[in-house]
């Protein structure tokens, strides 16, 4: 839902935190595509920022990013991509957060599995949106939580990042259920 965008962004920034250039983080592995070392600021990787702006994203650029800088990127590249304005309240936040964390296709597939009876194609279209609106949003959200957690636990780096991913998943579910 359109009115949940700001609530989502506030939660997202809390989860994504500040600057990191942790080489174990897959998001930092590619660098920025212009020969600069990979880094992440407010959850935005150097690669993503360079793609979004069309300019190199060296560490000094990444460290200078503000919430206001990254807000339009999150709206365009994540919230809008999963059509969050068209999703039920709560489902929008969970789906958009997973889109940031694991990409739009993964977020859509988990949503489609959570809804049941849908072709799992990784794209949120009219059929997916209609099916979600026909389901109990609390049931969809709980299914989404378990699908998301199963995905995290399947990752090789769950041992290192799993505690944070699990906390994020739980906090996202709690917020989402509170606005259904």
Could you tell me what each predicted segment is?
Residues 1-180:
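Cell-wall polysaccharide-cleaving catalytic domain and substrate-binding groove, primarily
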């Amino acid at each position: 839902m359109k009115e949940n965008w700001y609530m989502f962004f506030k939660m997202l920034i809390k989860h994504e935190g500040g600057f990191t250039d942790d080489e174990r983080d897959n998001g930092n592995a590619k660098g920025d595509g212009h020969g600069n070392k990979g880094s992440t600021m407010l959850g935005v990787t150097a690669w993503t920022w360079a793609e979004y702006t069309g300019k190199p994203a060296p560490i000094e650029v990444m460290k200078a990013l503000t919430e206001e800088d990254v807000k339009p990127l999150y709206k365009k590249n994540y919230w809008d991509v999963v059509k969050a304005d068209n999703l039920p309240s709560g489902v929008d936040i969970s789906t958009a957060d997973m889109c940031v964390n694991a990409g739009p296709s993964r977020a859509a597939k988990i949503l489609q599995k959570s809804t049941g009876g849908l072709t799992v194609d990784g794209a949120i279209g009219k059929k997916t949106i209609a099916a979600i609106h026909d389901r109990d949003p609390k049931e969809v959200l709980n299914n989404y939580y378990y699908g998301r957690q199963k995905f995290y636990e399947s990752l090789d780096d769950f041992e290192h990042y799993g505690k944070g991913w699990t906390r994020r998943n739980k906090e996202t579910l709690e917020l989402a259920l509170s606005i259904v």
